[in-house]
C-alpha cells in the first residue's frame, strides 16, 4: 500500500484493533508491496502512535536462527480501516536466515575472488573486512537471493501473461530469453535457470552501497546521480508492464556479462530517472523502526549485547515525541564488538601439561619432540604437518598443547581432532580422555547440538569433517558463540587431522572427502596434520586435495622456528610447514620389530600355530591379525573362538558397533586376538600387544608400515603368503603391493632414505637380523623357536583349515546354514555323504576308502586314513572331535591289537572297541560288551583265519559292526570274491597284514564306512567333508557336545513355532481366526519397526541373531524367528501407550539381541495377550470386519463439543477441500502441518512427480528428524516412517486412487468444476501427521465415542476406509 493512499483509511480504533488482534481467525496474512514478505513473523506487542494515528506493531521473526537479531528492523506499521479485515504490513528488507546458517565473518577468500571474477572479469580487487562480511551473506544465504530472483521473474511473467496482446510487453525479454517472446519462453524451467544466474547480480545491486570496492564508482558520480539502493530495491519490484520493460534492461545488462557493474548501475540510474518522469516516484515511509526495536530489546534484557545512541531511560512517550525532532530516526542498532583477550603462553605450560598427564617424572622422548610441542603451542605458524615414525608419540605432540590451552582461565579453547576410521576414533577417545585433563566428546555431539561450553576436544572421523553440517557450524561460529554464551571468549583452537596421508592414498574414499574443501580453515587458530607415512610428495598432494595451498616449497628444518612474515592471507592460503622427523633422525623406522616373511601352505593354519605358541609363552599378551577380506575376517573369528577370546571388526559393521568392539578389546584384558581388515592397523595403541600377523597378499608399503607400527615396544610381525600365489598386482590409483625381498630396504625407498643394499646395516629387524632388537624381543623369538622345535619333535602338528579356505566365501560355508526369510539362506542340517569313512573323513571324492594294509616287519597297524607313508599309517580315526570308530581286531604273531584314535608315532593301539562320546562307532564283535570287542577263534595253529560274524561259506564275511547311534554303521568285512580273507583277525606268521578298509579284487575287506552325522566335523556342519577335525593343543580330543544341544534346541523351536507357510504370522500363533487376522494383520511392520539395537545386530545369523555355529534355524523354514519377534513386539505395542511401551522396551533389554529368547518370553503370556487384544480391539474389529457404520449423532460429546459434528456431509467435504486448497496454494508441508499445525513451506513436495522425490523433499527439510524427536516415532527405527511412503499400504493406495477417479467422474457428470483433492502421498502424509498428533488424537477419541485408542500406524491408516454418517445421514470418510 502506498503512503499516498493513506487518506483512504480512517484513524484506527485502538479497541477494535485489540479485539481483532486477539481473534486469530480474523488475522489474514497480506503480503507487503516489497519482495521481502517471506519472513515469518508473529505479533508480540503493539502501541498507538497518537501523533501519526498509526498503530505500531512489534513483530518477532520466528524463522531467525539468531534470536538476538530477531528484533532488528522488524517493527512494522499497521493501519486498520473501520471495515477493513486485512492488516497491511510493511516488512523491512532484512534477509531471511531460515534457509541457511548465520553469516560468518571469515569467508574463504578464494570463493569471493571467484565470485568477483565471474561478475567483473577482473582478478585484482581489494577487500576489507567489511566487504568480506557483506559478500559472505550471499554464499551463506544464496537460497534467499535465488528465491528473490525467481519471484522477480515470476512477477514479470504473470503481468506479461495477463496482457498477451501487448506487443511491447512481449518484447521486453526478447534479448534476455534467446529472442523468444516472454509468454512462450519464460516458463517455470527458464525462470529457475535464469534466476540462478541472476542471483549474484541481484545481490550486488542490493548491497552496492555497502561495498568499499565500488566506492570509487560512487564517488565519480555527481551528487544527484548517486545510487539510491532503497529506490533500487523498490524498482526491482515491477508491478506494471512499463516497469517490466525497465527491469528487463537491467537483467539484460547483467546476464550478458558484457558490462562491468558500473555500467549496470548506470543503466539502473537511467531507468530510475525514466521511472520518476512517469510520475511513479514515492517518498520513503518514515517509521519508528529503530527506536521501537531498541525498546523491545531493553524489555527482553538484551541491551548488554547492543549499544544505541540514545538513552535507555526514556519512556514510550519520550520515544514517540522525539521521533519528529530527531533527524537521525533511521539509526541502526549495531553489535558490540569486543576483541577477544588472549592469555599469554609460556614454554612452562607444556611441561606442566606433561606432568599432569604422566606424573612428576615426565620427560620428553628427545629434543625433537620438545621443539615440536613448542612449535605447535607457541609459534604463529598457521599450518603444520609432521611426519614421525609409528610409535614415536605423535599424539603427545598435540595432546600436551591441548592440555595447556585448557588450563587458560580467561579463554575457552575448543579444538577438533579427526581420524580416518571409527576404530581409531574409539582408541583416541580412551587415550585423550585419561587422567581427566581434557573433556573429550564425539564430534557428532557438536554437529547435532552445537558447542556445549564444557568440551575441550571433539573427536570425529573424516566423514564428519566433510559433512555440510560441520562446515556450516564452523562458518557460523562467531554468531553462535555470542548468542549462546554472550561472550567472545570461547575460541576455536586447533584443527588436528591424524593420518592425513589417507586423503591422497585412499582412492576409493576420495569422493567422500570433497566436502572438506568447503571448510573455513581460517576460523581455527592452527591446523595440525600428522602421519607416520606421508613423505613430502604424498603430504603435498593430500593437503591440496582438501583445498589448502600445500607444503612450503622451501624445505624447513625442525630447528628453523622462524615466525611467519604475513598471516593476513589466512590459514587456507598459507603454505604448510613440514617437519620430517624420519629424515632428520636418518633412522629407518620399525627397526625395533622382528619382521618375518613366510610362505606357507595354509595361512590360517600357520597363523593359528603362531598364536597358540605365543599364548603358551605369554598368556597375558595380545595379537592382531590382518585379513584381506571381510569374509575372511568372519571365518577366522568363527574358527578360532574355541581356542581364545576373539574380537573381529571390518568395514561393514556400524559405527557404534566398531567403537564398542574396539573399546572392548583395548580395555578388556581377557581379549586375546583382534581380527580385522587394514582399518585395525592405523593409529590404534594397544598395551600387551606382542604379535601382528598379516594375511593380505596385496599389502602396500603404507599398510605394512602402519601394521608393524602397532608394536610400540617391540614384538613379532609375520607376513604370511601362500606358496606360488604371491601376485604383486597394482590396484588402480593406489600404491603397488610390496615386493618379495628385504622389507627394510623397501621402507628406506619409501621414505627417501639412503639405500644400504649390499652394505653393512642393510637389514634392520628383518631377514634374520636381531642386532637392533630389544632384549625382550630377542628372548621372545628364542622361546618361540624352542617351542616350535619341541612341537616338531613330538609330532604335534595342528590340523587346521585347508588352503582352499582362502578362496572360500563365508556366505558359502557358514551363512548358508542360517535360515532367514529375508535373505533366503536355507538351513541345511543333514548327514554327511552317504558313504564316508568310519569317522575320519579322509580326502576322497564321494566315498572314503581306508588305507590298504601296510606290511611291516613284525607288527601291523590297521589304518583307515589314506595319506600313510611306506611303513606306518595312522589308526582308525586320527584326532577326531566328536566321533571315533574303533579299528578291527588285528592278529599279529599270536597277539591281536585294535587301534582306536591313535595319535602316536608308530604302532600304539588301544582296546578294540572304545565307545567314545555320543557318536562313537563300535567295531569288530557285536557279541561283546558296549565298549570292548575281542578277536574270535584265535586258537588255531599257525595259519588260522578267524572270521567274525561268518554267515557265508568260506568266501564271504559279513558286516562286523551293527548300527550304532542311529547314524553310524561300520562294515568291517563285506563280501568279496572267491578268496576273501577276514580282514579283522588275519593270521600271519612273522609278518602280518591286517586289512581294515581296503577295496580290491581277490583279497579285500570292506572299509568301515560310516554314515557320519554332522557332529563328525569340527563345526557341527558336514559340508562335503572338506574340513579335517582339529585336535586340541594338549593332545586331548576336543569333545564337542554343543552341536547336540543346538540340534535339540532346533527341534524344540520347530515344534513350538511351526511355520511352513510364508503367510505365517504371530497373530496365527496367538490363535486368532483368519478373518480376524485379515484386519489385525501387521502390514507395514518390518525390522525398521524395531528401535535401534533391537533385533538388528550385524554379523550374526539374520534368521535367529545367533552365531552361525549356534544357529537354530531349520531347513525349509519360511518365516524367520526374527520376523516373528518383531511382529510379537508390534503386538505388545498394540496394548501399550507411549509411556508404557517405552518402559516395556527397557524391561526386555536382555532380549534386544536375542529374538529367540524373546519369543519364548512372549509365548509364556500367549493366552493373556490374546484376551487383551480381543477385549481392547473389539470395537476395531466390529468396524473394520463387520463394517459397522459410525453415526456422529450417536456421539453426545461430539455434538456438544464440535461444530463439525453438526455439519452436513456436503459442508464437511467443502471444508476438507478448502483446507487442501489453502495448503496447495501456500505450498505448505503437509506432514508437519497436520503434526502440530506448523505452516512450513516445502515447494518441492507439491512439485514432486513420484514417491522418491517426495520423500527426498521431506527429508531435505528435516521432517522425519523432527517427527522422531517430537513424537513416539522415536520409539521405532529411523527409517520406519520414511518407508511408509514406499512399499507399504499398497491396498489402501489402490482404493484411494480408485476413489479419486470416481470423484472426478461424479463431478464431471454434474457439470461442476472438480474439486482438487490431494494425491496419495499428500493424503498419507496427512494420516501419518494426525497419527502422531497427540493432541488431535486425544480430542478425537473424546468426541467420537465409538472409537478408542490405536497404537499402531497400520491400524490408524486402515480406519481411513471407514465411513461416517454425517448429521444429514450422508456418508463421508472417517
UniProtKB/Swiss-Prot annotation:
Please verify whether the record's keywords include Hydrolase.
yes
List where Low complexity composition bias occurs: 832-1011
Specify the inducers: Induced in absence of telomerase TLC1.
Known EC number: 5.6.2.-
Q: Which residues bind ATP?
A: 388-395
Region (Disordered) residue spans: 321-345, 832-1035
Location of the Helicase C-terminal domain = 609-758
PANTHER family, per the entry: PTHR31583, PTHR31583:SF2
Q: What does this protein do?
A: Catalyzes DNA unwinding and is involved in telomerase-independent telomere maintenance.
Name the chain's protein.
Y' element ATP-dependent helicase YLL067C
